[in-house]
Amino acid sequence: MTKISKIIDELNNQQADAAWITTPLNVYYFTGYRSEPHERLFALLIKKDGKQVLFCPKMEVEEVKASPFTGEIVGYLDTENPFSLYPQTINKLLIESEHLTVARQKQLISGFNVNSFGDVDLTIKQLRNIKSEDEINKIRKAAELADKCIEIGVSYLKESVTEREVVNHIEQTIKQYGVNEMSFDTMVLFGDHAASPHGTPGDRRLKSNEYVLFDLGVIYEHYCSDMTRTIKFGEPSQEAQEIYNIVLEAETSAIQAIKPGIPLKDIDHIARNIISEKGYGEYFPHRLGHGLGLQEHEYQDVSSTNSNLLEAGMVITIEPGIYVPGVAGVRIEDDILVTNEGYEVLTHYEK
């Protein structure tokens, strides 16, 4: 079943006339055309009969024509009201309620004479949750480039280098491999600075005998990777190394349990129980992982409350961590494809 037919099914389920998609990444997912419209209207209208209409600034029309999108294009000037160029009466419209602003909703009510709204967010999330072979290949390449980033960063480590200098070196060097954009702000944290799970790299200088935490990802043809490694620089304290070994055991055990039909919460429990049994449960303050694709964090989450089942074609992260203030912060993260038989680890830098 195609993406569009899934949306049409949801329109029928909710007795709606059309769906209005405005998140740029979701528009790209359905059309193959990517735009960052800023304050301008950029939206895909999917009607119950399968017709697709893309609203975009007139200056982008030629680019849309050159894209895979084959539906109707409504290009508008900044001085024009886009809705006046495509007059419609839509009784019930499905929207991305998590994204659409109140101001835009008011425009839809007046522009399309909308009487009521429904939600299409979950349907789109479920579609994006299962990756096609093409999407998997792009994520696999993004993961390969993330491995290269870690390699670049580790080779640059030396006493007195700052966290910020390592970040800059990684992001500048990886451009030589065709990377134009990272998935998120690269994180490099030294020693007990890594005890802050989302710490900000700064001017702290590297000293012998501490761990270095790398958390980074690369975007390849719109698809993200997201991986973490915690690397020894010298010989960290015995407690820090003990923490590392516990995190590695938790991650390895959770990954080995991955296969279709297993509840996501069970995977979280495996890692969390290992960490808790070793006395560090209070120092593991976040979920075990999350979905990965067009965004570095997307549906679904690998958490203790998610009863949904793993399915072949999902790509998730597994990233247990222990963060002890004044001692160390250790996190290890890999990107995992759920296969028909079990799993495939997409990130490979040594642990």
UniProtKB/Swiss-Prot annotation:
One Pfam family matching this protein: Creatinase_N
Cross-referenced InterPro entries: Creatin/AminoP/Spt16_N, Creatinase/aminopeptidase-like, Creatinase_N, Pept_M24, Peptidase_M24B, Peptidase_M24B_aminopep-P_CS
Q: Which UniProt keywords apply?
A: Hydrolase, Manganese, Metal-binding
User: One MF term in GO for this entry?
Assistant: metal ion binding
What's its EC? 3.4.-.-
- Entry note: cofactor: Binds 2 manganese ions per subunit.
Cystine connections: none
* Record-linked Gene3D superfamilies: Creatinase/methionine aminopeptidase superfamily, Creatinase/prolidase N-terminal domain
Obligatory cofactor(s): Mn(2+)
Q: Where does Mn(2+) 2 bind?
A: 215, 226, 333
List residues binding Mn(2+) 1: 226, 290, 319, 333
Q: What class of enzyme is it?
A: hydrolase
- Family affiliation: Belongs to the peptidase M24B family.
The name under which this protein is listed is: Uncharacterized peptidase SAR1786
